[in-house]
Amino acid sequence: MGTRFLLALCLVLLVLGFEVQGAQLPQQDEQPSPALLSQVRESLSSYWESAKAAAQKLYEKTYLPAVDEKLRDLYSKSTAAMSTYTGIFTDQVLSVLKGEE
């Protein structure tokens, strides 16, 4: 390789290096505008309120006392079972962590 080739290569790399340095923009941490956050919050809360209202209307429209009583009974039985199984699981975990004495 000749010195001309190396000189040309160095010049090209130098120019490319300056181009890359010139292309870098100072990074600015742009904070999202409070107006945008408030708009998003308001839209989400309006969606949530409309979903709650629709669910309430559906519940009132299809309310049956017999079904409600069955659901309450099912809930009480399932919570009792879960508390029992949670106690068993807790005892097992504690015995594994404590080890044999």
Swiss-Prot record:
Residues 78-101 are annotated as: Lipoprotein lipase cofactor. GO terms for molecular function: phospholipase activator activity; phospholipase binding. One of its GO terms (cellular component) is high-density lipoprotein particle. It is found in: Secreted. Keywords: Chylomicron, Glycoprotein, HDL, LDL, Lipid degradation, Lipid metabolism, Lipid transport, Secreted, Sialic acid, Signal, Transport, VLDL. Proapolipoprotein C-II is synthesized as a sialic acid containing glycoprotein which is subsequently desialylated prior to its proteolytic processing. Proapolipoprotein C-II, the major form found in plasma undergoes proteolytic cleavage of its N-terminal hexapeptide to generate apolipoprotein C-II, which occurs as the minor form in plasma. InterPro entries: Apo-CII, ApoC-II_dom_sf. Residues 1-17 form the signal peptide. Gene3D superfamilies: Apolipoprotein C-II. Pfam families: Apo-CII (PF05355). Residues 23-28 form a propeptide. One of its GO terms (biological process) is positive regulation of phospholipid catabolic process. Residues 66-74 are annotated as: Lipid binding. Belongs to the apolipoprotein C2 family. Component of chylomicrons, very low-density lipoproteins (VLDL), low-density lipoproteins (LDL), and high-density lipoproteins (HDL) in plasma. Plays an important role in lipoprotein metabolism as an activator of lipoprotein lipase. Both proapolipoprotein C-II and apolipoprotein C-II can activate lipoprotein lipase. This is Apolipoprotein C-II. It comes from Theropithecus gelada (Gelada baboon). The lineage of its organism: Eukaryota, Metazoa, Chordata, Craniata, Vertebrata.
